[in-house]
Amino acid sequence: MTKNNEVGWNLDNSYATLPQSFYTEIPPTPVSSPELVKLNHSLAISLGFNPEELKKEAEIAIFAGNALPEGAHPLAQAYAGHQFGHFNMLGDGRALLIGEQITPSGKRFDIQLKGSGPTPYSRRGDGRAALGPMLREYIISEAMYALDIPTTRSLAVVTTGEPTYRETKLPGAILTRVASSHIRVGTFQYAAARGSIEDLQSLADYTIKRHYPEIEAHENRYTALLQEVIKKQASLIAKWQLVGFIHGVMNTDNITISGETIDYGPCAFMDNYDQGTVFSSIDTQGRYAYGNQPYMAAWDLARLAESLIPILHEDEEEALKIAQDEISKFSVQYEKQWFIGMKKKLGLFSNEEQDQSLIEQLLKMMEKYKADYTNTFRSLTLDTLENTPLFDSPEFKEWYKLWQSRLEKQEESKENAYEMMKNNNPSIIPRNHRVEEALEAAVTNGDYSVMEKLLEALANPYAYSTDQEEYCVPPAPTNRPYRTFCGT
């Protein structure tokens, strides 16, 4: 173990206080010649690290799993999950939690190495990761953070100097992922499937203490836990929908209890507005299509509620009723959050009866004319309606008049309305073709400048800067349909 006081390591290991069935202690597998290719300076500082120290060889060795910082307690977490509806016992097959960094402000964040070698949960996998998917997770997770969407984050990416073998030979890499925690719906499913009520209670109590301490004294704290997670997920999914983000693999092991977005494998952002948009190559039935995401979140949360039944109430029928009552509230909470967000996207401060139909009409027209989701709202925000099939259509012109008169009815000025729109309609998202272009340059040519430029533009999605304009252009029709693969 290396001592790193100048660096800023301040690790704790509260997860290891859970019953040992929840994890396996295992060291990372060393790699031959690690090289740091990306470090997140601002995140490093907020975690209490000195970024310049993190660039030194001793710290790069930690990011590669060749050394451990003082206080590290590497472990692979066990969990279960419904993957495309099928239940499996799972676990960290190629990731290790090395500890929880306590920040200068007293916050706690998991530090996880992804691609750190095989674990008892690897299921015939090699425990390694390829450079492209690790850089992709870095780009998208940081873009999500800039969009103000709760997310895990990326501290560093190192190349390993070793190949990984998938369909082809690819350069290996390890991502250092930072999360409020890695406790998932699947973690609770794992506890419930093992049948120990004591273990289930231990996990629930730990989760409450870590994420929802305000409900610790609640007389029905496990019901309150379910309520809090439902609230967090309703807000999160609404935020996804409002920016056109499609996760692609909403299995229960990818739904966090903290309400953060996790696992950027086959995710992508929607170009043309279409409720049926799917990018993932393995989602052949469209289970996790854009328009299905709220329903799938409710389904996943129902699996959490099921797992909690043994501790919701001593009477099983009563426990079942509590679970059903709470799950039924998800759709109401989601709709409310989405509606509030959509009104902000259209500059609507007050509540009017016509607002719902105003929103629905616009979305219907966008789908009909295959309008670009992000750029339609961007154009409305800038009030520059260039020639597009949507903006040239008679029904849009009619809608535009209604919308303008609705804005004029408000007490707030139009200037304030457009300002609110600017703060809620990103002018830039990580366009799929731009992300691929950056990855191609980095992985194939070792040129990280394309990625750096993209990251710089994505860091301020609401800036409406002229420097970002080249990134606002949708892909050429030949670039569609875009397909994603579960590389992360």
Curated annotation (Swiss-Prot):
ATP binds at residues 91, 93-94, 114, 126-127, 177, 184, 263. Keywords: ATP-binding, Magnesium, Manganese, Metal-binding, Nucleotide-binding, Nucleotidyltransferase, Transferase. Mg(2+) binds at residues 254, 263. It is an enzyme of class 2 (transferase). One of its GO terms (molecular function) is AMPylase activity. The keyword Thylakoid does not apply. Its cofactor is Mg(2+); Mn(2+). The active site is at 253 (proton acceptor). It catalyses: L-seryl-[protein] + ATP = 3-O-(5'-adenylyl)-L-seryl-[protein] + diphosphate; L-threonyl-[protein] + ATP = 3-O-(5'-adenylyl)-L-threonyl-[protein] + diphosphate; L-tyrosyl-[protein] + ATP = O-(5'-adenylyl)-L-tyrosyl-[protein] + diphosphate; L-histidyl-[protein] + UTP = N(tele)-(5'-uridylyl)-L-histidyl-[protein] + diphosphate. InterPro entries: SelO. The keyword ATP-binding applies. Its EC number is 2.7.7.-, 2.7.7.108. Belongs to the SELO family. HAMAP family: YdiU_SelO. NCBIfam families: PRK00029.1. Nucleotidyltransferase involved in the post-translational modification of proteins. It can catalyze the addition of adenosine monophosphate (AMP) or uridine monophosphate (UMP) to a protein, resulting in modifications known as AMPylation and UMPylation. This is Protein nucleotidyltransferase YdiU. It comes from Bacillus cereus (strain 03BB102). The lineage of its organism: Bacteria, Bacillati, Bacillota, Bacilli, Bacillales. The gene is ydiU.
